[in-house]
Curated annotation (Swiss-Prot):
Gene Ontology CC: plasma membrane
UniProt keywords, alphabetically: Cell membrane, Lipid biosynthesis, Lipid metabolism, Membrane, Phospholipid biosynthesis, Phospholipid metabolism, Transferase, Transmembrane, Transmembrane helix
EC number: 2.3.1.275
UniProt KW Lipoprotein keyword: no
UniProt pathway annotation: Lipid metabolism; phospholipid metabolism
Known role: Catalyzes the transfer of an acyl group from acyl-phosphate (acyl-PO(4)) to glycerol-3-phosphate (G3P) to form lysophosphatidic acid (LPA). This enzyme utilizes acyl-phosphate as fatty acyl donor, but not acyl-CoA or acyl-ACP.
GO biological process: phospholipid biosynthetic process
Lineage: Bacteria, Bacillati, Bacillota, Clostridia, Eubacteriales
Protein known as: Glycerol-3-phosphate acyltransferase
Bilayer topology: Multi-pass membrane protein
Family assignment from sequence similarity: Belongs to the PlsY family.
Keyword Transferase: yes
Biological source species: Desulforamulus reducens (strain ATCC BAA-1160 / DSM 100696 / MI-1)
Compartments, as annotated in UniProt: Cell membrane
Family annotation (InterPro entries): G3P_acylTferase_PlsY (IPR003811)
Length: 200
């Protein structure tokens, strides 16, 4: 039976995930609606592309903190797989479908990475290395995000992680690929934005 505490912290995690740091920072930093710039996404990559490295890094860190804080809170209050994984999914759902922006948000990568870091650091570190290698070689952040996400359940399996965490990582990878469907289309067409490419 699911405890009322579990339900409450899952709702709380969704609300934490819904905080649109990219949107807020762009508005207060430069008075713009980040949804009308670049890719239209509120995540760190689009903020970086539109406003520069410093704002992009700030959003990246804040979005990761959403995932980390929600999962750590769940572990403190209700340390069961149902509660912890429910909270991890909820904080990512909040980031992707934020209540405050009419359910149009980011692509879960930063917030998801924060949640997984709090769940199981080593698979996340290995997935990050896949992301980093891909980005350095190709200069495509989106491709790195896709391959890093896809590699996550592989690392979970190879490192014999909790079965529930493995299932969770498969869901995260599938969701990340789906959220990047437009990026995949641009990658195929050769029109995806590269690091170092001048804004047009």
């Amino acid at each position: 039976m699911v405890h009322i505490t579990t339900v409450m912290i899952i709702i709380g995690a969704y609300l934490i995930g819904s905080i649109p740091f990219g949107f807020l920072l762009a508005y207060f930093w430069k008075g713009i609606d980040i949804r009308k710039c670049g890719s239209g996404n509120i995540g760190a990559t689009n903020v970086w592309r539109t406003l520069g490295k410093v704002p992009g890094m700030i959003v990246l860190i804040l979005d990761m903190i959403k995932g980390i804080s929600a999962v750590l809170l769940a572990k403190q209050l209700e340390n069961t797989d149902i509660a912890v994984l429910g909270v991890a999914l909820a904080v990512m759902a909040g980031h992707s479908w934020p209540l405050w922006l009419r359910f149009k948000g980011g692509k879960i990568i930063a917030t998801g990475a924060g949640a997984i870091l709090a769940l199981s650091p080593m698979p996340l570190l290995l997935a990050f290395l896949v992301w980093l290698t891909t980005v350095v070689v190709s200069r495509y952040v989106s491709l790195g995000s896709i391959l890093g996400a896809v590699s996550l359940p592989i690392w979970m399996a190879l490192l014999n992680q909790n079965r529930h965490y493995l299932i969770f990582s498969v869901l995260v990878a599938s969701f990340a690929v789906w959220k990047h469907s437009s990026n995949i289309g641009r990658l195929i067409k050769g029109t995806e934005f590269k690091i170092g490419q001048k804004k047009t």
